[in-house]
Curated annotation (Swiss-Prot):
EC number(s) on file: 7.1.1.-
PANTHER family xrefs: NADH DEHYDROGENASE SUBUNIT 4L-RELATED (PTHR11434:SF21), NADH-UBIQUINONE OXIDOREDUCTASE SUBUNIT ND4L (PTHR11434)
Organism per entry: Leptospira interrogans serogroup Icterohaemorrhagiae serovar Lai (strain 56601)
Chain's role: NDH-1 shuttles electrons from NADH, via FMN and iron-sulfur (Fe-S) centers, to quinones in the respiratory chain. The immediate electron acceptor for the enzyme in this species is believed to be ubiquinone. Couples the redox reaction to proton translocation (for every two electrons transferred, four hydrogen ions are translocated across the cytoplasmic membrane), and thus conserves the redox energy in a proton gradient.
Record's protein name: NADH-quinone oxidoreductase subunit K
Length: 106
């Protein structure tokens, strides 16, 4: 296994991915705005993509890069559908805070 990608050690990429993942998880746990929560979920997905690409390059396999392509496509669809739902709820409730979105309550 090659321990360097373009002269940078693999563990640097993995540490960066862990930092990005942690920021994303903290954003999901702390934020109240639905848009910011979606952005935090995108950070989580991008950190996972970074891990896939890192191991794909290190092991000289293309499988990780193919998986990243599909994850990005699914993330784009998730963002489009999620933001459409947030906009629809915002038109009704006049807020995008998830604490105040209680459409399922009577």
């Amino acid at each position: 296994m090659n321990h360097f990608i373009s002269g940078i050690p693999i563990h640097y990429y993995l540490i960066l991915a862990m930092i990005i993942f942690t920021i994303g998880v903290a954003g999901v746990m702390v934020r109240r705005s639905a848009v910011l929560i979606f952005m935090s979920v995108e950070l989580i997905l991008n950190s996972v993509n970074l891990v896939f690409v890192t191991f794909s390059k290190a092991l000289h396999q293309i499988d990780g890069e193919v998986v990243v392509f599909f994850v990005m496509a699914i993330a784009a669809a998730e963002a489009a559908i999620g933001l459409a739902i947030v906009i629809a709820i915002h038109r009704i409730k006049k807020t995008s805070y998830v604490d105040e979105m209680n459409l399922m309550k009577w």
